[in-house]
């Protein structure tokens, strides 16, 4: 705070130099842009929201996004890894964002809906103990009004998903259980109903995940750029959430297969896994994408969400090696964030299908965490100007027409819970 006050005191003395430099810049580039266009570029910031991974801990992001929208701070660009890519893809599908309906949709999640037995084939993902069924669970949500799959280019808010590509040399050296098309060792049919963390074999695999959090093993790949704008949004989010050796995703859309083949070839990788392995809170990647012209402006406020920072919990000591490895990434990413929200408390990262009451609790926690950030983001997003008594009026942004199916259509496609366990769980927690 003292440093900010000192900077404000110095600012008045720099005003003259700033005015002079502004005039020189406008004169030098008079054939490229007008003074009004320069002022509009410098005076207005875009909101870039970076959503980090963290499994079930990321349910707090729903409440965080609710608070952002309440403040009128709709993201201009979203980028996410792992669970953050799932929430980002959902929020980006339509404008205005029907956040309350998304909360109702999230409350229909179950383990049987999102997890299944390991697949018999492997082509683009990495063999795991479970098949990730998010694409099936969210099929209606990621359909256009005409019934086609929503592609990255169809999203109402610009969104990109970060996946980790396993380098070919590292992929070839992996144990066969990671590469071969075989059933996982854990085959109990009851597991999809239960928290993923209960199985000792799953816990053992999770310990091995830390080995993938290494730039010599994986590299970050951004899905949503010009080369990948035709990817299905649900496939991008699913690959970004595929914990190596635990959750395995493969596309079910034949149209996607040549696109994925090309992605592996172009990036010289052997498989796509959880984006958190390469960049769990990808603020640096967000900054580079904006620098490269993603938004048409470089003047942006970078707000980062992190739910997977080390938190003491004796029930989940097995997560410590992973959270510590992830924190090493933050040394590189944190300087690019204007503000970093470290959510606390959170749900367990292993709780991938919380009950209705538990989701409500996570939303409250997330709402409270982001509420403390609103004064900061509000100040950062305040326009600035040089002439007159008010900021220049920016040009009207083109209206974005949502092509996503209505939420009433999505909700009507969700089967009501028929399993006694699901009904009992929600009744007990309501």
Where are these regions (language model features)?
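Active-site gating loop/helix substructures
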Residues: 160-288
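C-terminal helical/tail subdomains of lipid-metabolizing enzymes
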Residues: 272, 277-279, 290-300, 304-311, ...
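Helix-rich "cap/lid" substructures immediately adjacent to catalytic or cofactor-binding pockets
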Residues: 15-78, 430
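Conserved small-residue
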Residues: 54, 64, 84, 161, ...
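Lipid deacylating catalytic domains
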Residues: 109-114, 129-130, 177-183, 224-226, ...
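Patatin-like phospholipase
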Residues: 55-144, 165-167, 171-194, 375, ...
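Phosphate-/polyanion-interacting regions in eukaryotic proteins
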Residues: 1-16
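A short alpha-helix-loop-beta-strand transition element characteristic
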Residues: 143-159
